[in-house]
Amino acid sequence: MALTLLPALTSCHESPQYSNDAYGNFDALWDIVDQRYCFFSDKGIDWDSVGRQYRARIKPETNILELFDICAGMLDELHDGHVNLTSSFNTSYYRKWWSDYAQDFNLRTVQQYYLDFDYGSTSGITYKMLLPDSIGYMYYPSFSYNIGETNLDYILAILHKAKGMVIDIRDNGGGALTNISTLVSRFIDKKVTGGYILHKTGPGQDDFSKPY
């Protein structure tokens, strides 16, 4: 989710009830998140309470820089690394989703000590046979890298003698479900229910489609 905060947000916002000041900009942002964010119930977030808490920090003289920090702090309460607030001078980002945890992965260590700097790479996937005809290794650093069926054909042809497979997704920040499905489908030979998708269908916090 990307939200843009500008000094005159209401000039391009179709809701006339928002005043063109710090309060109006804050209220517009709060409403957008209230109507479109999906995980309030899952996370147990009282968005009304969060809104009151941060709105109370606004004063008539609050400038755009101060307002940005207030709004960014409110969005941080979602604890969601996919939610950003973007302006012409800054972009907020919830860093604690990774900064609060120890860094336990070093790509250089893998490349040097496990792969001996000798490996293949395609579609963002690093791959190699570890141990003679024994363990296949694939490192997929981001689900945003598009995987081609032909690329997978080559990788799996090279690793076809492997008795086991390591699919390393450490430090992967996420991406597209389609890429995950393309990869995982190569290791499943029957129909499997791996999850469900729900779509937001209305402005209410619990307005979702049926799972499919």
Language-model-detected regions and their locations in the chain:
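Sec-dependent bacterial lipoprotein signal peptides
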Residues: 1-11
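Flexible, low-complexity junctional segments that flank or bridge functional domains
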Residues: 11-212
